[in-house]
Amino acid sequence: MDYIIDYKEIVEQAPAEEPARQYYFMDRVRELVEMKKQEGYAAHCMVEVMGCQMSAKDGEKLLGILERCGYTVTEDDRDADVVLFTTCTVRENANMKLYGRVGRLKHQYERRDGMIIGITGCMMQEKDEVEGIRKRYPYVRLVFGTHNVYKLAELLYQTLVTGKRTFEVLEDTKMIVEELPSDRRYRFKGAVNISYGCNNFCTYCIVPYVRGREKSRNATAILRECEQLIADGCLEITLLGQNVNSYGNDIPGSTSFPELLAAVAELPGLRRVRYMTSNPKDLSDELIEVMKTHPNIERHIHLPLQSGSSAILKRMNRHY
């Protein structure tokens, strides 16, 4: 069956504001998926996470969006019509793992009509890697980076309707899109992003270049998400950021990290709070006091010292 869809008109009718724009495209993808199901389209999806806790959180968002679009999650890529990879680029073996996984999907792509293989995450923020994917893996249909994960529905719709490959990688953005669907892996625990990116530029680290400059979320939005998780049965929450200790430094008059941590710990029904990662230069007496006075904050500090040599630390640009 051929579908007559005026893609240009659909885009023109889309709301300009987020997240309304993405929910609009989720509905458009769902309509298309329902039509394809009448022809035997299974509408199964899979997201494979390769990377840190931030990548895992991105994976939950991607799954939530795909389910809202009408897809059903599968753990077997042989059954999947959409396979997405969230990538890491800190370690070289993570890149090699991705190449191997994508290479093994070639035959499935050739056998499964309409299959979409997509890649996102830190690795896709490197231009050379993106160009390598574009040239060596023509069956990879969708590529986007860390700064527009929220746009999955819009980019997926473009790929489905136009039949063309979609590559959209932003160098940076100040935008934080709230209130998107998410599918938690565990019912009893969850993770909440409190900030994105990093301003430290340690000499050995690629994170500021692939995750961008530090952007703190609004404290009210963070607390609202935590409350929703608790209402959904979540007993343990991990607050995530490249450097949680510097939360709020980019927003004049913002809530500090110790203040935010205390507010989260005091939410009724929450048994345990964790956080990661942190930089020793931003560790404060106030944070230690908050941990001391709130017994449900895990007695654990992820504090990567890196070196005991001041000279080496200076060369690392660690600032302590």
Question: Which residue ranges define each predicted feature?
Answer:
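Proteins enriched for Cys/Gly/acidic motifs involved in redox and nucleic-acid/cofactor modification
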Residues: 1-247
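Conserved SAM/AdoMet-binding glycine-rich loop
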Residues: 114-119, 128, 231-320
